[in-house]
């Protein structure tokens, strides 16, 4: 089960009714199902902030010391490393090591973290990249969840693994690779 708390701090988000708890739960479940490590956890929690340029700028400055609006910020609740994850049924990358859950407390429950999305940046990017707002949001949600569970894109190898996972999950929802449009 996935519990999602959504805070909408910007009225423009209300124009996109299909971006709701049900969609976020479905995307989160599909993303987590890519890894055997999470199959034993019965309950996940995720907090979502849907906001605007002003608030995301403040958050980006406060937490990353970057004075610029961005499309999304991810705040993991746990220090996980993607290299400790066991991939379910794909050959993207694999480890036989169990993920370390002892420091998380109750292994039946996992708070994934918090994600803040900026309407204005996502809207502009989707327009520039000729994508629907919803498809771009879904891609960014998958990308952010991967960050919450320890993925990063600090080098070419990690970037490729992350992008391949995103493409695979997006395809499940009938969404084309976002990287074909921007590369």
Curated annotation (Swiss-Prot):
Annotated GO biological process: rRNA processing
The keyword Signal is assigned to this record: no
Sorted UniProt keywords: Cytoplasm, Endonuclease, Hydrolase, Metal-binding, Nuclease, Ribosome biogenesis, rRNA processing, Zinc
Cofactor: Zn(2+)
UniProt signal peptide: none
Cofactor remark from the record: Binds 1 zinc ion.
Keyword Kinase included in the entry's annotation: no
Main location (coarse class): cytoplasm
UniProt binding sites for Zn(2+): 143, 147, 153
GO terms under cellular component: cytoplasm
Subcellular location: Cytoplasm
Enzyme Commission number(s): 3.1.-.-
Disulfide bonds: none
InterPro entries per UniProt: MetalPrtase_cat_dom_sf_prd, YbeY, YbeY_CS
Molecular function via GO: metalloendopeptidase activity; RNA endonuclease activity; zinc ion binding
EC class: hydrolase
Family: Belongs to the endoribonuclease YbeY family.
Classification via PANTHER family: ENDORIBONUCLEASE YBEY, CHLOROPLASTIC (PTHR46986:SF1)
Stated role: Single strand-specific metallo-endoribonuclease involved in late-stage 70S ribosome quality control and in maturation of the 3' terminus of the 16S rRNA.
Protein name: Endoribonuclease YbeY
Native source organism of the sequence: Rickettsia bellii (strain OSU 85-389)
């Amino acid at each position: 089960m996935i519990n999602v708390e959504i805070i909408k701090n910007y009225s423009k988000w209300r124009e996109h009714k299909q971006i709701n708890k049900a969609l976020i739960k479905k995307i989160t479940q599909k993303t987590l199902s890519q890894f055997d490590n999470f199959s034993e956890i019965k309950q996940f929690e995720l907090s979502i902030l849907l906001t605007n340029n002003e608030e995301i700028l403040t958050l980006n400055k406060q937490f990353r010391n970057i004075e610029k609006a961005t499309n999304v910020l991810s705040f993991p609740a746990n220090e996980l490393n993607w290299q400790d994850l066991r991939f379910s049924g794909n050959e993207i990358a694999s480890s036989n090591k169990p993920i370390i859950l002892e420091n998380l407390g109750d292994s039946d429950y996992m708070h994934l973290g918090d994600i803040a999305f900026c309407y204005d940046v996502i809207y502009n990017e989707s327009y520039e990249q000729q994508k629907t707002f919803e498809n771009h949001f879904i891609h960014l949600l998958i990308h952010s969840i991967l960050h919450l569970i320890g993925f990063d894109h600090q080098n070419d190898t990690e970037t490729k693994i992350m992008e391949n996972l995103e493409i695979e999950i997006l395809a499940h929802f009938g969404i084309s690779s976002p990287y074909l449009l921007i590369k």
